[in-house]
Amino acid sequence: MFALYSRALFFWLILFELIAGWRRWWGLSWLGPKLPRALLLPSLVGLRGRHVSMSGWLASLALALPPALLLQIAAGSLRNPRLTPLLRLRPGHYQQYTIERLDIPMREGHLPALHVVPRAGASAVVCVVHGSGCDKTSYAWRLVDTLVERGLALLLIDLDGHGENPRTQSFPAITENAEVAVTWLRARYGRVALLGVSLGGCVAARAVADGVVVDALAVLEAPPLLHYTQADVYREAIALVRPYLLDIFNDCTAQALIKAWEYPPIRAAISTWDLIAALDVSGSLAQIDTPLLLIYGASDAIVKPTQAAQVWAALPAHAAFHLVSGASHLTLILTPQVLQIVGQWLETTLITPPQRQTSH
């Protein structure tokens, strides 16, 4: 029985490895990209054995599937310890862009930031404001790649109370982060946009409503209020199981993903719940006349579609609104459809209009 179970376990490991190589999910591969996988096929065919009944083989496969999946994930992480996209968000020179670490002066303290510039340079820039409990690099690599490919620079900042920012999360001082970032960027770029995710969207919208001048504002999954239960948290975790998210393992291991979720506690003089209520994203958005993009996830268990509808009802007529099917709170910023919408809208808003005006 143990021998049959072991063969079933190896069957799954070989099958998973073949799939990982075919899909280029190197973060789930224990063989790596250079070794030939065709050599595994004969073993896969012969593992059942001649004298094993089909029912016994299927039962062994069912028992071996869960541990085999865990072993595959763990082996991929051990085999590829440096396969993490966060390495591409460190200061330095890369094939497509350069990254400079900044401490932008503020009235009190400073604003830590990463300045990402395409190799060919850029005339327009997007300041990215992260969500609660995150930092400037949180799941930002796909967004960085998307915008750099479209000729846009980025400024990734740490909000008060988060990451390397020495200041405490408080209201209304947190909106100074967006103000200082935009002022710094205005001195260097012709067109400037703000993009805020969740809490960052609330901060960005309030800053613009209070007078910060930008050429475009994109707000992703910003809550009018926080109302969720532990059951909603479980629903959000289940929503992580999305087929399109498996492609994240092209350049990331499971261990790297888990580490990307590890953040120190927020240093706060006001709770995130009270801060979001004070920022009043719906009231802020209603006052904004700059080009405006709103995106929410239809499977978001934290900012539910009913709350997205509340925000949509308050939007000015010129705003673009998208409710993306299948996207949850944690997966929205990684969703290819969302990245396509954001990238195309920002490119059109920040780069295309001036070119069209000069050609007519």
Regions inferred by a protein language model and the residue ranges of each:
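Catalytic histidine-centered segment of alpha/beta-hydrolase-like enzymes
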Residues: 327-337
